Amino acid sequence: MARLLTNRQADELHKSIIAYLSANDLPNTAAALRAELNLTEEDFDATAVKKYETLLEKKWTSIVRLQKKIMDLEARNAALQSELDNLTPASLLKPRRDPTSWLPTHPPRYSLESHRDTINCIAFHPKFSSLASGSDDFTIKIWDWELGELEMTLKGHTRAVLDVDYGSPQGITMLASCSSDLSVKLWDPAEGYKNVRTLLGHDHSVSAVRFIPCRNLLASASRDKDVRIWDVTTGYCVRSIQGHTGWVRDVCPSFDGNFLFSSGDDMTARLWDISAIPNPENKVTMAGHEHFIECCALAPPTSYQYLAPVAGLKGPSYPKSAAEFMATGSRDKTIKVWDVRGTCLMTLIGHDNWVRGIVFHPAGKYLLSVSDDRTLRCWDLSQEGKCVKTIKDAHDRFVTCLSWAPGVAKDVPAIPSNTAKGESSEIKETLKSPDVQIRCVIATGSVDRKLQIFAA
């Protein structure tokens, strides 16, 4: 039989056994073992016996204590593993799906409640699992969408919060909000969402706010018919853009920060070139809706391959600018998809009430929309805008807003803001789609005061 103990360990064990037997009035057994092991009185005298007589008992009780500790640690480990499994994002526990074709399914992962009035707007943190929502109850709430928990409530606005947006001017993530109280507020997540700045200048309700990528700027749209551009650092309005003849309800910047797309109650959508802030240019005005335009969105470069053939364009599979295609949603119950020339490429018909929010799928193939008809619809741009999925009763009442969690983008080559007109098209052709990892998570808000989280 193979030995587990070294010679020294075996010798220590033998002496401990002999000492234990001697101390417990078993001299004959001890003597027999001593004889078997050839231990003489000189090798193992009375003094040595005294040294070893309690050693066996100490080791035995130590083993019992260690065994109990092992059992306790195993139980604790099992509890922690169970807790970890519950905290692990479901998207990591399930088999990986192709994010480029993922669409939301019913029921939602979470239905979050805490607001006391209509939820008007939602925005995802660009990196973390935080989600901001703004409401008619004057508050902004910060949620953890992975855990389905409310983290905090921000108070500061004195009227309804109409829009929120996360951005990273100068590499520092901030939250912007706007309200019927005529103000735009900036909040710092790194300081517990402290209100670090309030921007004043609009003469009526501020309906939309967006950080302008790649620049230290913020855009806001208002019922006063203006679009304003703000310097985030100073809080000063650096430009007021006028052109709309009615309430400007929504504004959307291009991913390179050189264009703004706006829409409103004058039933038009306008594309602005803001590459030169002092002299913004209205590149094109799009008209065709028969009612107020509630929302607008610029198509990501990934949509170009699906929309270019419809527009009759041929060439490389990426746009020459960051504002080649766009979409608008209206109270006339339709969604229209446009090209940069102002041509309506598609009219998507299917909603039975006002269209309140639209968002392009990050992979570019789909357009998602929500409406006062309580549905969430998915339109396939590769099939000329066919509605391929409808989530009925996404909410109990009107669905007011929709947002897709942004992927984490790598550096993207952008058109320099000082590019002169007529300059070589080689610069523009360097503009390609951002390299992002798609997060399959969307959120919707409603008059029913609920925030629905749909996730893979």
UniProtKB/Swiss-Prot annotation:
Q: Which residues form a coiled coil?
A: 61-88
Which spans of this chain does UniProt mark as WD repeats? Answer: 114-153, 156-197, 201-240, 243-282, 288-348, 350-389, 394-437, 439-456
Q: Explain the purpose of this protein.
A: Positively regulates the activity of the minus-end directed microtubule motor protein dynein. May enhance dynein-mediated microtubule sliding by targeting dynein to the microtubule plus end. Required for nuclear migration during vegetative growth as well as development. Required for retrograde early endosome (EE) transport from the hyphal tip. Required for localization of dynein to the mitotic spindle poles. Recruits additional proteins to the dynein complex at SPBs.
Q: Which is one Pfam family of this protein?
A: LisH_PAC1
Example GO molecular function:
dynein complex binding
Q: Name one GO biological process term.
A: establishment of mitotic spindle orientation
Q: Subunit structure of this entry?
A: Self-associates. Interacts with NDL1 and dynein.
The answer to whether keyword Cell cycle applies is yes
Q: Which residues form the signal peptide?
A: none
InterPro entries noted in UniProt: Dynein_regulator_LIS1, G-protein_beta_WD-40_rep, LIS1_N, LisH, PAC1-like_LisH-like_dom, WD40/YVTN_repeat-like_dom_sf, WD40_repeat_CS, WD40_repeat_dom_sf
Per UniProt, subcellular location reads as: Cytoplasm, Cytoskeleton; Cytoplasm, Cytoskeleton, Spindle pole
This protein's UniProt keywords: Cell cycle, Cell division, Coiled coil, Cytoplasm, Cytoskeleton, Microtubule, Mitosis, Repeat, Transport, WD repeat
CDD domains associated with the record: WD40
A cellular component term from Gene Ontology for this protein is: transferase complex
Give the LisH domain ranges: 9-41
Family (UniProt): Belongs to the WD repeat LIS1/nudF family.
What name does the UniProt record give this protein? Nuclear distribution protein PAC1
Q: Domains: what does the record tell us?
A: Dimerization mediated by the LisH domain may be required to activate dynein.
